Every structure is written in C-alpha cells, then in structure tokens.
A protein has these predicted regions:
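N-terminal pre-Walker A segment at the start of P-loop NTPase domains
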Residues: 2-26
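Short acidic, glycine-rich loop/turn motifs
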Residues: 21, 92-96, 128
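ABC ATPase nucleotide-binding domain
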Residues: 29-31
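Hydrophobic anchor at the beta1->P-loop junction of P-loop NTPases
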Residues: 38
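Conserved lysine of the Walker
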Residues: 46
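Conserved P-loop NTP-binding catalytic core
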Residues: 50-115
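Electropositive, glycine-dotted interaction segments
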Residues: 97-234
Length: 234
C-alpha cells in the first residue's frame, strides 16, 4: 500500500492480474499501475478482462458461482478456441505489494443433483508479496480443506468442511486465527465497479441526500457530491 496522501491510505494498488480460460482469454497476465487503460479492437478481450476482475471481487462475497451462472454457466464462459484439452478449469488471480490470491474453478464430480453444472472451487491460494512462492504462502485450499500458516511458520488446519461454492476468503477469515485472510477479504470487498452507473433523471447520483466524508465512490454513484467534495478537501 502506498501512503503519500490521505486518499492513498484507502488504496491498495494491484500489480498483476492473471486470467486463464475465461471467454476470449486463454492465458493472460497483465501488469497494472495506479491508472491502467486497456484498449483494443472489438472482441479482443477488454470486457472479459474487466469481468474477470469483478469475478475475483465476487469471491470475497461468495458470489462468484451466481455471477458465472448469470453468464450462462462455466461451460459458456470457458475458452472455446482451438487447443483446449484436459478438464474444465477457470483460473483467476491477482497480486499486489502486500498480498496475492489465486483460485481455480471447475465442474463438480458429484452424482445426481439439480445443480450439476454449478462451478465449484477446486483450489485457492493466498500469499504475501507480489510472487507466489511456497515460502510466501499464508493460506491454501484444496477441495473442502483449508489450512493457514501460523506465526511460527507451521501449518494449521482451518477447515475440513468448506462447501465447494464457498471461498476460504469469506469462510475462514478471522481476526485472530487468519488475519491475513481477513485483511484480504475486506480489501477485495472494498473494490468498486462503475460500469453500470446510471445517468438518467432518476439516477441515485441525482437524488438529494445527506453528504458525509466519502473516501470511495459507491457502486451506484449515489454519493457523488460527497465524494467530489472529499477529494477537494484532502
């Protein structure tokens, strides 16, 4: 985290975004900066890159499965180009100066169920620093089991009953037993996406409301005036 001004204290800069097998993105690793502008022709993957970041944010709210279902299910969102082999596997991840996170989603291996096409979380990993290394791992999940690293470097089982549609980021995070997961979860939940901000006459941003100091504009832009004034003052 960079803290050169009061506004910077609420920012957490991502350095890298990685996506594999999502829509038009077969395998992509993108370096990021404080302001990153993505350009390209229609169909080049700009929207897919943005959606992948939103899916990562949904992981912190246990909303990724529903989000993928709204897109037509995992089979509809997978890379469908030439050269696809092996099991269905959608991989997403990001890294910053303090934390990194990666998740692998696939299809369930279960018997009779009405939800047989729901994606399930196969593996997850959380690490400190910008690079995923065994020594940097602070938490990892495989199937229904998640473990976290204690202060002395030893591993401790945090859960053996994670449901396939629940992320360890949302389920295992704890201020005492898994503080790194808690910090990561809260920062992921603080991400904002403004692609659906309304501008019509009845838009939330056009309605009267009491303004308070607002360091981050809300998803719907309802606190636009307060956020603008906060920026002017800090």
């Amino acid at each position: 985290m960079r803290t050169s001004s009061p506004v910077d204290k609420v920012l957490w800069v991502l350095d890298t975004l990685a996506v594999a097998n999502y829509r038009s993105l077969r395998r992509l690793v993108v370096p990021l900066r404080r302001c990153t502008v993505v350009t390209g022709l229609n169909g080049s993957g700009k929207s897919s890159l943005y959606r992948s970041l939103r899916l990562l944010a949904d992981m912190a709210r246990n909303g990724a499965v529903n989000a993928l279902a709204r897109e037509g299910g995992l089979a509809s969102t997978m890379w469908a180009g030439p050269g696809r082999r092996g099991p269905v596997s959608l991989k997403l991840g990001f890294a910053g100066e303090e934390f990194g996170y990666a998740v692998d989603l696939g299809l369930p291996q279960v018997g009779k169920t009405a939800f047989g096409l729901d994606p399930e979380i196969k593996t997850e990993a959380v690490w400190t620093g910008p690079w995923l290394r065994p020594a940097a791992l602070t938490a990892e999940r495989s199937g229904s089991m998640a473990r976290v690293r204690d202060d002395d470097g030893s591993w401790r089982i945090a859960s053996t009953a994670l449901r396939p549609y629940d992320s360890m980021v949302s389920e295992v995070a704890d201020p005492r037993d898994a503080p790194e997961l808690l910090a990561l979860r809260e920062r992921m939940r603080s991400w904002r996406f403004y692609d659906h901000v309304r501008t019509d006459g009845a838009a939330p941003a056009r309605q009267a409301r009491i303004g308070t100091r607002t360091m981050v504009l809300n998803h719907d832009g309802a606190d636009l005036a307060a956020a603008w004034q906060t920026i002017a003052e800090v």
